[in-house]
Design a protein with these regions (language model features):
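Residues in well-ordered beta-strands of folded domains
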Residues: 15, 31, 139, 301-302, ...
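Hard-cation-handling environments
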Residues: 205-335, 339-521, 529
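Short glycine-rich phosphate-binding loop at a beta-alpha junction
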Residues: 96, 389, 551
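Conserved beta-strand scaffold positions in the cores of enzyme catalytic domains, especially
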Residues: 14-16, 122-124, 195-197, 332, ...
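A glycine- and charged-residue-rich anion-binding loop/surface
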Residues: 20, 44-48, 52, 69-70, ...
Length: 557
């Protein structure tokens, strides 16, 4: 490890607000005295038990508490786990965004959807350009990833230089643009780097990550071997290089290309408009035009590679897509690997497609956009940091990168595995976690942001598991005498027509309860509701071993 040049004795605070010990929701604050810059601002997708939740974004309480210090956001690339929370966060902290051209283009579309395009300042940054904000100077470095225009960041502070790789791979033969700027990593390394924050996603995988161009050869073989079939290819919408290679194959084999899926249409529109996607004249057709061409002259590029229930491919598979129906002998290609948690959904879609007679190809048509072990070692050798700080990944991924650092000669004192919320204070003299800040999940449900918490989720889980029983009764004002009811309405508990005797017995339990309350002159609504819930709940549990949500409703006349 090379000793860094002696720096100011002040300490840089590195505060991950999300993205550690998880996949997604990446966001990290860098603080020095009265300046804070934020690197990326991503979302994650809900866990299976987050019923009804659309998105999960980071809790930015710490940034709001220090809003006067926050100078800007630096974005490494345009994936949802790095930009998805921007519209929500910038409604509360409106500071400039700095990113490369394509990344800004994707962010612009998001801001436009939220009506924020005129209120948020964005600046396109070129590779090699430096941005000065407060105590910081930030340089963008060319990298490769599964989306174009990805960048690493060299963050210059009075305490030293921190290199943040963002999501990256080492690709010497990219489909578009230049290879990763390894020379610049080496030049910065010679200056003396305090810390390297390196992508850990593939830290468990040995070897080097394959070039994106290798997928092009596989795709070409598929087009060659399936000349007589319609081809449908599902991939990540953001993988513009993959889309480019599919279009290249389509042109070579004389096929028209139809794009399906909202996110796919959006990304292709942005990428082609900004010059990141080359579209031969007249190669694109609308999905409605497919019927005008023989199957062997068409290819459909679609969303749904992860088995998402509402994505285009899923709707094709289950027969609910209005414009595309799966035909026997269709060739369907999954040009992706299932992300953790989506394996079951992907397998289900593959089975449905095969049942319809389609030929499904789902192996060896994808390469990762993340660095494997040898790529990570290469970056370490070039940057030669004093401290290793693994980022981006679950705990096991962070540990895997820590082991790589150990193999390269780093002792445990110079490897910092952080958790979201940790405050790492670091300079030339040392690095230590000195405290924690508040972090957590903010759930987005439709137009509601943060108004759904664990209590609401528990209610939804209970409703999903055991259903609901509503007890309706009418009482006379003043005397509290029962005039009508109690009547029972249930949903998701039992099928009433097949459980009439159970419901009759439940009605008897309620009648007995109300008679007892009347005899005891109980007129307090709160007491009545509690007694009704307890009596009915005990009966239902005894008879069914279920605990539905019970809601008594009292009307007074």
């Amino acid at each position: 490890m090379k000793k860094t040049e002696k720096q100011n004795t002040g300490k840089l605070k590195i505060i991950p607000l999300g993205g550690l010990e998880q996949i997604g929701m990446n966001i990290t604050a860098f603080e020095y005295e009265d300046s804070i810059i934020v690197v990326v601002c991503g979302l994650s997708f809900p866990e299976d038990d987050m019923l009804g939740i659309d998105l999960v974004i980071p809790d930015i309480t710490y940034l709001k508490e220090n809003i006067d210090k926050v100078k800007g956001f630096f974005i490494t690339h345009g994936h949802e786990d790095h930009i998805g929370a921007i519209p929500y966060v910038l409604k509360e902290i409106n500071v400039p965004i700095y990113a490369t051209k394509l990344t800004i283009g994707i962010i612009d579309r998001k801001l436009e959807e939220h009506g924020m395009l005129k209120t948020v300042k964005r600046k396109v940054v070129k590779y090699g350009q430096h941005i000065n904000l407060g105590c910081f100077r930030v340089e963008f470095i060319k990298t490769n990833h599964s989306i174009q225009d990805a960048a690493a960041l060299a963050i210059y502070s009075p305490a030293g230089i921190v290199v943040h790789t963002g999501d990256f791979k080492v690709d010497y033969t990219p489909v578009f643009g230049d290879a990763i700027d390894l020379a610049r990593f080496g030049e910065i390394g010679k200056k003396g780097v305090l810390a390297l924050m390196c992508d850990s996603t593939n830290a468990e995988r040995p070897g080097f990550t394959q070039s994106e161009k290798s997928v092009g050869k596989v795709l070409d073989g598929i087009f060659e071997d399936h000349r007589k079939n319609r081809i449908i290819i599902a991939t990540f919408a953001s993988n513009v290089d993959r889309v480019q290679q599919i279009i290249n194959c389509a042109e070579k084999y004389g096929r028209k290309v139809a794009i399906e899926g909202r996110s796919m249409v959006n990304i292709i529109s942005i990428a082609s408009e900004l010059g990141y996607l080359s579209l031969p004249d007249n190669i694109l057709i609308d999905v409605e035009q497919l019927r005008s061409y023989p199957d062997e002259q068409t290819v459909i590029i679609t969303t749904g590679s992860q088995g998402e229930s509402m994505a285009a491919l899923s709707r094709m598979a289950n027969g609910t897509h209005r414009k595309v129906s799966i035909k026997p002998n269709d060739t369907i290609v999954f040009s992706s690997n299932p992300i953790p948690g989506s394996e079951k959904s992907v397998t289900g879609i593959i089975n449905e497609l095969m049942m319809k007679g389609a030929d499904v190809i789902f192996q060896d048509v994808h390469v990762s956009g993340h660095a494997c072990q040898e790529d990570i070692k290469l970056i370490y050798s070039l940057v030669n940091p004093k401290y290793a700080i693994p980022v981006h990944g679950e705990y096991k991924h962070l540990v895997a990168q820590a082991k790589i650092a150990e193999q390269l000669g780093y002792d445990t004192d110079h490897i910092k595995i952080l958790s979201s919320g940790d405050v790492l204070e670091i300079n030339e003299d040392g690095a230590k976690v000195t405290g924690r800040v508040h972090v957590g999940n903010v759930m987005v449900d439709g137009l509601g942001v943060g108004d759904v918490g664990n209590i609401v989720l528990r209610d939804r889980q209970r409703l999903a598991e055991d259903g609901i029983i509503i007890v309706v009764m009418t009482l006379e004002a003043g005397s509290g005498q029962l005039l009508a009811g109690p009547d029972i309405v249930s949903r998701g508990f039992v099928y009433v027509r097949n459980s009439e005797s159970l419901m009759d017995e439940a009605k008897c339990v309620l009648d007995d309860t109300m008679e007892r309350l009347t005899d005891n002159n109980v007129t307090d609504w709160g007491k009545i509701k509690t007694e009704v819930k307890d009596a009915l709940g005990d009966f239902v549990w005894k008879e069914t071993k279920r605990r539905p949500m019970i809601i008594p409703i009292i009307m007074e006349v």
